[in-house]
Amino acid sequence: MDLQGKCVLLGVTGGIAAYKMANVASALKKLGADVEVIMTENATHFITPLVFETLTGHKCMVDTFDRDFKFEVTHISLAKKADVVLVAPATANVIAKMAHGIADDMLTTVVLAAKCPKLVSPAMNTGMLENPITQDNLRTLEHYGFTVIPSESGVLACKDVGSGRLPKEDVLIEYILHTIARPKDLAGVRIAVTA
């Protein structure tokens, strides 16, 4: 599928799997997508914004109050521009913030303002993922219309074995493609059928 004319917003949070999102950004660009990346401050400890800027050709946003850009209300303009948002790897911290409407950084303000489909791919230690609080937060996001991409199982960065791995890049891209190609809801649209 060609993603020409589509904007994919990647929200990268502070998990060890953050580096994998560089391959996702690169693959989406090859499919013709306009890729924007927002990183949390914690994500910058795992991969630098420069990597995403080089791959996408856009400034990678981290700081909500960054003044090194043309004047616009950046979090709103990015929210309006996006055809789909993918937050991956989604940490327990960012999942909790999104589930409760906490918008205290660039990523969470954009997600809160975005009206496009939103995908969340949790990636964390099994104990954190299976914690009832995290599970409640994921259900809350689903209730609000987010699509939660199931984590994969395997050996985690902490050497535990279990669920919590970020899915492979092609799985994440397939979710994006499916979401963009999904037929739009026609609720509230008047259609005249004539014979």
Regions found by a protein language model. Give the residues of each.
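A cross-family phosphate/adenosyl-ligand binding-site feature
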Residues: M1-L119, N125-A195
